[in-house]
């Protein structure tokens, strides 16, 4: 049995029970969902007590026989040096991590890395486009529930809904 701490999206963070069988099944199925194979180097800057790091990176990488590169903590300053050091091809993120990375000063060699794709939550449409342009890495946004059985993922070719509302009188 594994206790995962939820993000607290709907209230206070809480411990959710996850069986070893569920984690193993998620690892096997998420290899295809996140396009993780044996040749990938999966960079994990997020804490392993969170479902994103465990279910979208660690378990699929383990199932695929890929390499996992861990860091002590997320650092926007250390992100690109770590990615280059490990020759990372995939990573996961949560919250505002992408905007923090994009907030670092640009360099002409930002795209000089091995990253191909990443999975996470809460990056704005503008940040998704900027990250691809700057680093050459496609971000896939999704939402899952640590204690639930489902995952919502945006199709790679889907258009995002506009986040504005106009009222008429």
Which stretches of residues belong to each language-model region?
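Conserved AMP-binding A3 loop
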Residues: 1-25
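Short hydrophobic "strand-cap" motifs at the C-terminus of beta-strands
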Residues: 3, 33, 45-46, 71, ...
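Active-site phosphate/pyrophosphate- and oxyanion-stabilizing loops and adjacent acidic/basic residues
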Residues: 4, 28, 99, 129
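Conserved S/T- and glycine-rich ATP-binding loop of Class I adenylate-forming
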Residues: 6-9, 42, 48, 83, ...
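Short beta-strand->loop structural element characteristic of the AMP-binding/adenylate-forming
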Residues: 14-17, 44-45, 66-73, 140
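Conserved AMP-binding/adenylation subdomain of ANL enzymes
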Residues: 24-41, 49-89, 104
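Gly/Ser/Thr-rich phosphate-binding loop
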Residues: 63, 85-93, 102-169
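Alpha-helix capping/helix-boundary segments
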Residues: 75, 97-98, 124
């Amino acid at each position: 049995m594994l206790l995962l701490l939820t993000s607290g999206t709907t209230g206070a963070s809480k411990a959710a029970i996850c069986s070893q069988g569920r984690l193993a099944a998620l690892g096997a199925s998420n290899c295809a969902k996140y396009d993780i194979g044996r040749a990938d180097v999966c960079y994990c800057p997020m804490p392993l007590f969170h479902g994103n790091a465990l279910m979208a990176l660690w378990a699929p990488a383990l199932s695929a026989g890929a390499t996992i590169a861990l860091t002590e903590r997320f650092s926007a300053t250390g992100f690109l040096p770590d990615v280059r050091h490990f020759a990372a091809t995939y990573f996961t993120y949560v919250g505002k991590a992408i905007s923090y990375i994009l907030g670092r000063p640009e360099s002409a060699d930002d795209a000089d890395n091995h990253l191909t794709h990443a999975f996470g939550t809460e990056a704005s449409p503008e940040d998704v486009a900027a990250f691809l342009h700057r680093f050459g890495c496609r971000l896939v946004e999704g939402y899952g529930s640590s204690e639930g059985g489902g995952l919502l993922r945006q199709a790679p070719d889907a258009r995002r809904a506009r986040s504005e509302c106009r009222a008429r009188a």
